[in-house]
Amino acid sequence: MNKFGAFLLLSMLACGFGAVSAQDAGNRGYKILQKVSLPGDGGFDFLTVDSDNRRIYITHNNSVQVIDADTLKLIGTVDNVPHPHGVVFLPDMGKGYATSGDPGSVIVFDLKTFKHLSEISASKDADVIIYDKASGHVVTFDGDSKNSTVIDPATDKVIQTVDLPGAPEVAVSDGKGYLYDNLESESKIIKIDAQTMKITKSWPLAPGASPSGLSMDLENNRLFSGCHNQLLVVMNAKNGKVVQTLPIGKSVDGTYFDPASATIFSSNGDGTLTVIHEDSPNKYTLVENVQTEEGAKTMAFDSKTGHVFLTTAQRGEAPTPTKEDPKPKRKIIPGTFHLLVLGK
């Protein structure tokens, strides 16, 4: 090896990547393509993309903001959604569902007019919401209440409320009759029968701790759990065995698996997007850590364009701690909320 080759290898190792294959290199080069300012100065949480119908749904400022995924223009707002968290959409039924953390309900809205259709009582801190095709149910995971609310979208009535053995975070459906959920307080993943809502398995994520974001490779039965101790844990969804762990940024809140490129993304509140390649179901390679912006911890992926969407806002200095509020949060600077578009 010549001196230049030795220097290049040492430089790559120092950056924490090691030798990068040609396939991995094809996943590199994500960058911020565009920043889109959006109105409102309140809090924000999850966002999701309807790639087929070209819509981005963003929970923000006691509402759901609806963005055209091509023009990136605000085209509508679902108003009066207090403390919004998650959104799921059912295009065939023409309606969407948004969780309202306080008082704890689900707002049903029309996908064309964005008007409220009904409000369904759930539990306090109604947070994550998903649709399971196998059972035909809409399911919420209610963090502080440590339970799950199951809704029949045909009637928009609650079928049952299920207690969980810990505070739930992000959940996914395998489309084959099972749900998987991160239990943040227990550092475990639970497997749930989607029809009966009975827990069939409970698996520790160690060495991962305090999991938040969760996504799944449906074909290869792999779960990707983003944990707050800066690890992405890859788990075999058949037997609960930890396949591999990889380093990610701080304050993760979202992960996504793109089957077309075999890429896992982890959106981190420290202002990074970790990109990982699935070389095989049992081998994963860290590709890059893309600089984003502080607070951009939730994400959505557009399967049509390959773009990653993140939301964030600038924050001021933290107020002086008091006895009543020993850890005051930094307040959002008015007029700074925006959507980040990342791609190659």
Language-model features and meaning:
Residues 1-8:
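Bacterial N-terminal signal peptides that target proteins for export
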